[in-house]
Design a protein with these regions (language model features):
Chain B
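Structured aminoacyl-transfer and RNA-binding surfaces used for tRNA recognition/handling
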Residues: 20-283, 289-345
């Protein structure tokens, strides 16, 4: 049993792509070895990565495939041997199988007697197989963006391949990837180790040899070490904590081979800038961690994760450099802030004509006008339903919502659009409700994000997004497959989420009505919103898919109502009675479908003669229907479903005893009418026939 | 990943070249406390920085070119890059390129922003396998002791839609400061490149301010008297230019005349491109006839249009509806020249 090591040495791979590629490489190597019968049962596959390398170590590779015997079947025995002598057919078969004619044997199968040969297949060595197959696996790795680097463009990869290590124990596996012959020499940290090759004594010595060369190849170890170093550096400030930021941790893990952390400071005076701006500069632009004091307020420090280990003088130089860069950015931000105040938001509406929203549609000035129209319609619907909000503030917020696009601060920090508008509105005393609505207009930015807290912010967010979706669909920019360049799915997800988690008395239809959409465009958007509601229930709220299908089949307009029904149904479906009801409803649907296909008419239940079991069902259903309807009206869905479940005995008895599709058309018609009525009366909460039963 | 989309809205071709470089003169070291004096006296002057980079790369086989003498928004637009990267011929060239971004002018009042900054532009076609190591050596050559700094290559791809050009690469970060854009060109003029090339763009003002540890671009020591050590600052050399071009670009430039210039340059370029189309499609034209066709002059006309567009934009004279159309007109010229140039090289 051997250990196999593969390391692909690369120029710095984009941090965002490394984790996926590392996992894929491990999977590909494991699958290759499994497919080729070279992986020992107890084998262990470990993957490693840094910005400059992807590696996989397999402990437990067989030296070679086991030899195998294979039974080949040739021509029929009669054709192969005439009068005991081998014919040309026998000779051809023996030659093909690589055995002498004398080794052919008679094989008896169900179809008759044939000439057969037993062939020994010698297992291929791991070295030979890996040398032949592995390069294809490596070059098959998926990258979000590829490049060419060699003349003649023989291959594409994320960045140029600069060295390859491939070893079985201490021996080099002679393979070539992208023109680079594999060897046993890796490379260490660019600066701390320098250019000297890192020769590996064996595959298994990889991790420790690289550690000596100032590279931590194990991602989890680097992550742990960075977190510890962040803690340690923060402890030098009394009461301080670094602000947890998992995505940023992952980024710096994939930007470093030998991480260390420095704590830097900035002048307290910059803390007068809004925290949003400070954190954006630190996190998004500089990849620094923010530090907060014991009251969770931003403290005048930051943490930078370095890809080196410097002496005290070096650390001082590095700290000084990072501080200067950060302070310059803060100064820029302050300059922009002060500069922007010279032109209040209220004087920027006109200049939105200079900012394109979408070239076929118009400017952000046009967009604002449209948003105002949609907002007025939504506001009217909300007012009619009696929910209180400040309409004047709302319309002011809509009018000013996009004006921050003309500010220098947003031009510099585009990710702060909306937030900057809100901060400026507050600074310019435009009213707290106006400011908050503008501030919150782009939330939720993701499915995990919270919805706006203010009704005005919710309405602004809805109006802005539905206007965008309807207008984009109108010019043929609906998302297709994986392509959604205008992030319309995200916009629609936000609409659903706002309706789900707010108290707004609005439905998908009323939002769409407010947008002024009509005709085919409206139908398209309606279907799109329903699809997003399906996504929300299934993927965000984790309702079982059959519950989602059942609930939406009974109505997909009122989002919060659909959630309530899904919750009730999820709870109810576990009971045995309910399972039986679901099965029965499925049966009813099937029978009605068959009847329809055969052209059987649905008759009259009352006039027709019903068997006792059918009559019992009719009576029970008639008694129950108003009760269920009343509970449904009250949205007491759990109780309603419990009531429906009580139908089980009569439903079971009905299907046990009654032949629904009776030959007598009158009886049949009565039965059909009965079950059709049951289906209609009790499918208002969910279409139970969608429920998957055991 | 940052691409130049952000700048698209701002000011066309010249500005689009590199989102990152556009901000090179923006982000910048600020006031310091300790050891500034010591650093300043030992650090390279602005012109020594350039000398060192030039001699470093000349020693490694690069042709040293002079700055291109037509206005450009970035070193990439000079024909030594934009046209030389096309076709199969290997080439290595380095040059300092003053790069104009009229809208970025600040009358010389902002310590971090300039109307015109200087890029040291390097094209290595094809890239040597040790191109990154060479780059690191060039940093050592300008006095950066890498063992006392933190260096990272962070993903940063680049595209210039108006030139039909894009590449992948990094922004090189030194102690949190972006000092170089490193790009592997993949396409130019809408054509796949083979061989590809590496483009290194050093932001000289930014690097000089870092090395000299000064607060403002204008405090950078450009040169020092060899006898007395008395400094000549960046401000002394360039402040008047920043002020006057800001006044021109924002206040004085005559919009109607700029449009006239634009239309004239464009008309001539289009006429030449029309001729080029016929010539390079012709089976009877000789190789000599094709090779003497003045595509380099045609390209200058396109560059003129690009710069005029940027001035008009800074002047606030380009409306939303016009913008896309004008960028398209410049693209037609730039991409047209690139295609014709490739055909001419093949002739």
């Amino acid at each position: 049993m051997s250990d196999f090591l593969l390391e692909i040495g690369l120029e710095e791979v984009p941090a965002r792509m490394i984790a996926g590629a590392e996992a894929e490489l491990g999977r590909r190597v494991k699958e290759l070895l499994t497919r080729e019968r070279l992986l020992a049962a107890e084998a262990k596959v470990t993957t490693y990565s840094t910005p400059r390398r992807l590696a996989v170590l397999v402990e437990g590779v067989l030296a070679a495939q086991a030899d195998a015997e294979e039974q080949l079947t040739g021509p029929s025995w009669k054709v192969a041997f005439k009068d005991g002598a081998a014919t040309a057919a026998a000779e051809a078969f023996a030659k093909k199988a690589g055995v002498p004619v004398s080794a052919l044997e008679k094989v008896t199968t169900a179809k008759g007697e044939y000439a057969g040969a037993t062939v020994k297949r010698q297992g291929v060595s791991a070295t030979q197989l890996l040398a032949g197959e592995l390069p294809k696996e490596v070059l098959g790795l998926y990258w979000a963006k590829n490049m060419y680097w060699r003349a003649g463009k023989p291959e594409r990869f994320v960045r140029p391949v600069r060295w390859v290590v491939a070893m079985l124990d201490a021996a080099v596996v002679p393979l070539e990837i992208a023109g680079i012959a594999a060897g046993n020499a890796s490379r260490g940290h660019r600066v701390l180790h320098g250019g000297a090759p890192v020769s590996l004594a064996s595959a298994r010595s990889y991790q420790e040899a690289l550690r000596t060369a100032k590279v931590i190849v194990d991602v989890a170890e680097r992550r742990h070490s960075i977190r510890k170093a962040l803690d340690k550096a923060t402890r030098t400030v009394v009461g301080a904590r670094w602000r947890e930021d998992e995505p940023l941790v992952e980024t710096v893990v994939h930007l470093t081979e030998w991480p260390s952390v420095i704590l830097g400071d900035f002048d307290r005076e910059y803390l007068t800038l809004p925290e949003e701006v400070l954190v954006t500069v630190m996190r998004d632009h500089q990849k620094y961690f923010a530090v907060e004091d014991a009251h969770s307020k931003l403290a005048p420090h930051f943490l930078a994760v370095l890809n080196t280990e410097a002496d005290a003088d070096g650390e001082a130089i590095i700290r000084h450099g990072n501080q200067k860069v950060l302070v310059a950015r803060f100064k820029d931000a302050r300059f922009f802030w002060d500069f922007d105040q010279k032109t209040p938001l209220t004087e920027r509406v006109e200049s939105l004509k200079q900012v394109t929203f979408q070239k076929q549609l118009g400017s952000y000035h046009w967009k604002t006008e449209q948003n105002l129209g949609v907002t007025r319609a939504l506001a009217a619907a909300v007012k009619n339903a009696g929910l209180a909000f400040d309409e004047t503030a709302l319309l002011k917020a809509v009018e000013l919502a996009k004006t921050d696009l003309t500010t220098e601060l947003v031009k510099e920090f585009t990710e702060l659009q909306g937030i900057v508008g809100g901060l400026y509105a507050r600074a310019q005393h435009l009213g707290e409700r106006v400011a908050l609505a503008i501030y919150e207009q782009y939330t939720p930015a993701s499915t995990e994000d919270n919805i706006p807290v203010s009704v005005e912010g919710q309405l602004l967010g809805l109006a802005d997004r539905i206007q965008t979706i309807v207008a984009m669909f109108g010019i043929g920019n609906a998302p297709t497959g994986s392509k959604d360049p205008f992030a319309l799915r995200r916009a629609a997800n936000a609409i659903v989420k706002i309706l789900a988690e707010s108290e707004l008395p609005l439905t998908l239809d009323s939002v769409l009505d407010g947008s002024g959409a009509d005709g085919a465009n409206k139908e398209q958007v309606a279907a799109f919103l329903r699809e997003r509601l399906h996504f929300y229930l299934k993927d965000m709220r984790s309702f079982p898919y059959d519950v989602v299908n059942a609930v939406l089949a009974a109505g997909a307009n009122d989002v919060r109502d659909a959630i309530a029904r899904a919750e009730a149904l999820t709870a109810a479906r576990k009971s045995a009675d309910f399972e039986a009801i679901s099965a029965a409803f499925k049966r009813i649907k099937n029978i009605l479908r068959q009847a329809g296909e055969k052209g059987f008419a649905v008759g009259e239940a009352q006039g027709g003669k019903l068997t006792p079991e059918a009559q019992q069902l009719a009576d029970a259903a008639a008694a129950l229907a108003p009760k269920v309807a009343a509970l449904r009206e009250k949205r007491a869905y759990g109780e309603a479903l419990a009531e429906i479940a009580t139908l089980r005995p009569v439903v079971d008895a009905f299907f046990d005893k009654v032949m629904v599709l009776d030959p007598d058309p009158q009886v049949r018609g009565a039965h059909l009418s009965l079950i059709d009525g049951v289906l209609r009366s009790f499918s208002g909460i969910a279409d139970f026939s969608e429920i998957v039963t055991a | 990943m940052r691409i130049s989309i952000k700048l698209l809205g701002k000011s066309d071709t010249a500005l689009l070249i590199k989102s990152v470089l556009s901000s090179i003169e923006r982000e910048f070291p600020v006031p310091t406390t300790e050891s500034t004096a010591a650093l300043q006296s030992s650090a390279l002057t602005f012109q020594e920085l350039l000398f060192r980079l030039q001699s470093f790369w000349a020693d490694r086989g690069c042709v040293l070119q002079q700055p291109y003498d037509v206005e450009v928004g970035a070193g990439t637009m000079a024909p030594e890059t934009f046209l030389r990267v096309l076709g199969p011929k290997p080439y290595r060239v380095g040059y300092a390129q003053p790069s104009r971004r009229p809208a970025d002018g600040r009358y010389g009042e902002n310590p971090n922003r300039l109307f015109k900054h200087t890029q040291f532009q390097l094209i290595l076609k094809p890239p040597p396998v040790n191109v990154q190591e060479l780059y690191l050596q060039s940093l050592e050559a300008i006095g950066i002791d890498l063992s006392r700094h933190d260096l990272k290559f962070e993903e940063d791809n680049w595209e210039w839609p108006a030139g039909g050009a894009w590449g992948v690469g990094w922004q090189v970060m030194l102690d949190g400061l972006e000092i170089t854009q490193f790009t592997y060109f993949q396409q130019c003029g809408g054509m796949d490149l083979d061989p590809i090339c590496a483009e290194l763009t050093y932001g000289l003002e930014r690097i000089a301010a870092f090395l000299q540890d000064v607060d403002s671009i204008y405090e950078i020591v450009w040169a020092r008297d060899p006898e007395t050590g008395a400094p000549v600052t960046y401000g002394e050399v360039r402040l008047a230019e920043e002020l006057q071009f800001s006044v021109y670009n924002f206040e004085e430039a005559d919009v109607a005349k700029l449009w006239e210039h634009f239309n004239l340059f464009e008309a001539e370029a289009k006429e030449l491109l029309g001729k080029a189309d016929g010539l390079f499609a012709s089976e009877t034209a000789s190789a000599g006839e094709k090779q003497r066709f003045p595509l380099l002059a045609t390209y200058e006309l396109a560059l003129k249009c690009s710069n005029l567009f940027n001035v008009l934009d800074a002047r606030g004279a380009i409306s939303v509806t016009e913008r896309v159309g004008v960028i398209g007109r410049i693209r037609a010229l730039a991409v047209g020249v690139a295609r014709a140039y490739a055909a001419q090289q093949a002739a």
